[in-house]
Curated annotation (Swiss-Prot):
Cellular component GO terms held in the UniProt record: cytosolic large ribosomal subunit
Protein name from the UniProt record: Large ribosomal subunit protein bL35
HAMAP family per UniProt: Ribosomal_bL35
Organism: Phytoplasma mali (strain AT)
Pfam families per record: Ribosomal_L35p
PROSITE patterns, per the entry: RIBOSOMAL_L35
Protein family per UniProt: Belongs to the bacterial ribosomal protein bL35 family.
Length: 65
């Protein structure tokens, strides 16, 4: 039987919290920040929880974690 592998790209993009919640970073913050408002840049900081409709798919992709 083939050994199952975790999705390498996804492992780099998410973090699993102490309470087993899946966290992700916000989009639209890598560059061109000067054209965005200060409020917009501030709200893009930090991590947010993955939507509950995506959790099942992510857990399948991360079967080894």
């Amino acid at each position: 039987m083939i050994k199952k592998k975790s999705h390498s790209g996804l492992k780099k993009r998410i973090k699993i919290s102490k309470n087993k919640k899946i966290l992700r970073g916000h989009a639209y913050k890598n560059h061109l920040a000067a054209s965005k408002t200060t409020k917009q840049n501030r709200q893009l900081r930090g991590l947010t929880m993955v939507h509950k409709s995506d959790v099942k798919r992510i857990k399948i992709m991360l079967n080894n974690l």
